[in-house]
Amino acid sequence: SLRLALICPGLLPIRNICVATSRSRGVFRKYKLSRIMLRDMGLQGLLPGFKKR
């Protein structure tokens, strides 16, 4: 579908989807992760710069 989106840009809407879980709601665009995965990976120390407040 990415190839089709490049050929006809107005044909398919670009959805923000989590790359880990394919969840479409609560996705942070900068990280392409859902809020749940962002929290889990941050607590595990997999994301540099994330810390618990």
Swiss-Prot record:
One of its GO terms (molecular function) is structural constituent of ribosome. Keywords: Mitochondrion, Ribonucleoprotein, Ribosomal protein. It comes from the Eukaryota. It holds the Pfam family Ribosomal_S14. The keyword Phosphoprotein does not apply. One of its GO terms (cellular component) is ribosome. GO terms for biological process: translation. It is found in: Mitochondrion. The keyword Manganese does not apply. Belongs to the universal ribosomal protein uS14 family. This is Small ribosomal subunit protein uS14m. It comes from Bigelowiella natans. The gene is RPS14.
